[in-house]
Regions:
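Cleavable N-terminal export/targeting peptides
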Residues: 1-39, 229-230
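Short glycine/proline- and aromatic-enriched beta-strand/turn motifs that initiate or cap beta-hairpins
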Residues: 21-73, 145
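Extracytoplasmic loops and strand-loop junctions of Gram-negative outer membrane beta-barrel proteins
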Residues: 28-29, 53-55, 157-165, 205-207
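Short loop/turn motifs that connect adjacent beta-strands in outer-membrane beta-barrel proteins
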Residues: 31-42, 79, 118-132, 185-188, ...
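Residues that define the transmembrane beta-barrel architecture of outer-membrane proteins
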Residues: 41, 62-68, 105-109, 130, ...
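Residues on the lipid-exposed face of transmembrane beta-strands in outer-membrane beta-barrel proteins
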Residues: 47-51, 70-74, 111-117, 136-140, ...
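Gram-negative (and chloroplast) outer-membrane scaffold detector with strong preference
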Residues: 78-157, 226
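Predominantly the C-terminal beta-signal and adjacent terminal strand-loop region
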Residues: 91-99, 104-106, 184-230
Length: 230
């Protein structure tokens, strides 16, 4: 089910971006060559909210949780930019023997490189209405309020699951990558749609994964992007 949701999100983002690129190709007189105009670096801030899905052993809807993100960065060339993002809110998962659902909170910080895919394919043009960006980066996350899992262990003395249970506040490394679609509304304002996959160490969800693998969190977010100095 999750694969279908992710594929649908990606197809929507890629489809809208493809229409934009096709339109630019169909009207070469409107297309700006990547070296034809002076480029000015641009700072921006983004505020987004939406839903997160934690990869786990329950139905898709059971593992949905709220998510939010705030970021700031700079577009420093026609193709590349960089940003610092703070994201997170809540993550959910399930333990099956005995069966119970649990949640915890986290905040992730990451430094990311952003590639303007539309400009790479169709040439840079100032004021483009629709653009697709690819981003990737890494940083650290802090988990806290892991109350449900600790309560389950405390209330069941014979329960020996959740082998990687943590208490209090815990720090993790974190990485993520994804796609971002910008729909320009005004000179300094855009609607931003973002889908990303985040990776964490195996103890992020307090339990042992298959082959001590990684824990995954997927986000679908929507919000506003403000360009500064335009």
């Amino acid at each position: 089910m999750m694969r279908k949701i992710v594929l649908i999100c990606l197809f929507v983002i890629l489809g809208v971006s493809g229409i934009s690129a096709s339109t630019a190709a169909a009207h070469p007189e409107d297309r700006q060559d990547i070296h034809s105009r002076e480029f000015r670096p641009e700072w921006f801030v983004q505020v987004l909210g939406g839903a997160a899905y934690s990869l786990g052993e329950a139905d898709f809807a059971r593992l949905l949780s709220p998510a939010a993100q705030a970021s700031a960065g700079c577009r420093f060339s026609r193709l590349f930019g960089a940003r610092v993002a703070f994201s997170g809110w809540q993550a959910r998962n399930r333990y099956n023997y005995p069966r119970f659902d649990y949640s915890w909170n986290y905040v992730r910080s990451s430094a990311e490189i952003v590639l303007d895919v539309t400009s790479a394919l169709a040439g840079w043009r100032e004021g483009r209405l629709v653009s697709l960006n690819l981003f990737a980066g890494g940083g650290a996350a802090v988990g806290f309020r892991n109350l449900d899992a600790n309560r389950a262990r405390r209330n069941n003395p014979d329960f020996h699951g959740l082998e990687k249970l943590w208490t209090g506040t815990k720090f993790f490394w974190a990485g993520r990558g994804g796609l971002e679609l910008d729909l320009r509304l005004a000179r300094s304002l855009s609607i931003c749609l973002e889908a990303d996959a985040g990776i964490f160490p195996d103890d992020f969800n307090s339990k042992v994964g298959k082959d001590d693998g990684f824990d995954w969190q997927f986000n679908c977010l929507v919000g506003l992007k403000f360009a500064l100095g335009r």
